[in-house]
């Protein structure tokens, strides 16, 4: 929540949040994290974040329960009830693909927030520990995006 509230004013366009929840951890927090991301982001992209022994798709399904607000009354005591804000969302279980898509779809002024792994340099899937670095992937995708724009536009990024 604190990260999203801090990032929100930095986005001059949309706030796009890429995140997942770790496997073999507190399952009750997953829909709560989904709800918070949906409330404070304009777009949410769900992905893997160290699924460990759990199925990444099941983890994403649990997070998604918080993304869709439950049915609410339209009026209470004769007064309209304001709608619950809920972001558009997508899911890409492959973390690299999720980061690539978030950056590819970002418009000028948008802020892409890649949350969860931070300083970690690996992704744990089953009993395998695979090399994975959010920062390196984001830099690589941004460099490719800049290069493509220069080639298409013939000018600077």
Predicted regions and their residues:
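ATP-dependent carboxylate-amine ligase
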Residues: 1-157
């Amino acid at each position: 929540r604190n990260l999203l509230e801090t990032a929100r004013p930095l986005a001059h366009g949309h706030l796009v949040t890429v995140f997942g929840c770790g496997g073999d951890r507190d399952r009750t927090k997953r829909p709560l994290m989904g709800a918070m991301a949906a409330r404070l982001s304009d777009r949410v992209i769900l992905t893997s974040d160290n699924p460990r022994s759990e199925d990444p798709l099941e983890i994403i399904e649990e997070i998604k329960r918080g993304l869709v607000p439950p049915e609410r009354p339209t009026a209470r005591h004769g007064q309209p009830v304001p709608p619950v804000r809920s972001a558009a969302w997508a899911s890409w279980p492959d973390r690299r693909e999720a980061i690539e898509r978030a950056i590819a779809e970002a418009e000028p002024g948008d802020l892409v927030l890649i949350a969860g792994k931070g300083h970690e340099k690996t992704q744990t899937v089953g009993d395998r520990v695979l090399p994975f670095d959010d920062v390196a992937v984001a830099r690589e995708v941004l460099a490719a995006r800049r290069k493509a724009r220069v080639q298409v536009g013939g000018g600077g990024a």
